[in-house]
């Protein structure tokens, strides 16, 4: 089954509040598919819109907690949204309830009575000029790291690092980022094909829920370590 993703900005106190979502976007509002590798490319509208949303909401330039959450991602406890056991009166068995799931919480934030929520419409209006901006650097304030976005190359599907770094749930559904690559694709016998782990596989999900910001100013990365992300062309 395919796994569907939503890009999400969390409130700075997201672990302590029952309403942790600051903003979220649906790929469908940008004519994109919801599977991770249907939109995780340089110059993609959905990714560009998310980066501009982060920039516009991050008014003090200290960064905001972010995640690219799939619908197969785990639900976990936070201080205000703990997991707990509840008896199912039909089965007479305890079930795990409650907890925090960013994908589900974002869905609730974006929708109101089957329509776009007022909050979502406000954000969409805030970032309506997203395609006029091209942020080149993504800074992780939690880990004191940064990554430079690869240059856009016409007619090439260059993987964008941000959705991969922020991914929660990758590897659990169709359309996810593949950690391995075939090194003898000319081999027609599938049983004889050989695979090796991609260099960028080490970064998958390592920034999920961390505090990030985006910028065009390389000077803003001073004091941060550049991660060893390799340019990767999917097609």
Report each predicted region and the residues it spans.
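Short, extreme N-terminal segment that most often corresponds to the first beta-strand
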Residues: 1-29
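Low-complexity intrinsically disordered segments
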Residues: 35-235
């Amino acid at each position: 089954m395919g796994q569907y993703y939503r890009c999400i900005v969390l409130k700075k106190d997201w672990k302590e509040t029952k309403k942790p979502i600051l903003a979220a976007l649906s790929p469908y509002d940008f004519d994109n598919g919801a599977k991770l590798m249907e939109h995780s490319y340089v110059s993609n509208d959905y990714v560009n819109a998310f980066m501009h949303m982060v920039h516009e909401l991050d008014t003090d330039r200290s960064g905001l907690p972010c995640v690219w959450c799939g619908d197969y991602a785990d639900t976990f406890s936070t201080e205000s949204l703990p997991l707990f056991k509840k008896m199912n009166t039909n089965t007479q068995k305890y079930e795990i309830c409650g907890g925090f799931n960013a994908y589900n919480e974002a869905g609730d934030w974006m929708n109101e009575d089957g329509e776009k929520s007022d909050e979502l419409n406000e954000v969409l209006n805030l970032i309506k000029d997203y395609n006029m901006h091209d942020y080149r650097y993504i800074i992780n304030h939690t880990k004191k790291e940064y990554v430079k976005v690869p240059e856009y190359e016409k007619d090439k599907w260059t993987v964008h690092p941000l959705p991969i770094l922020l991914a929660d749930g990758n590897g659990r559904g169709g359309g996810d980022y593949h950690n391995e690559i075939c090194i003898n694709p000319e081999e027609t016998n599938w049983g004889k094909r050989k695979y090796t782990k991609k260099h960028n596989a080490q970064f998958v999900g390592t920034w999920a829920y961390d505090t990030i910001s985006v910028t065009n100013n390389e000077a803003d990365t001073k004091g941060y370590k550049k991660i060893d992300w390799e340019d990767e062309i999917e097609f």
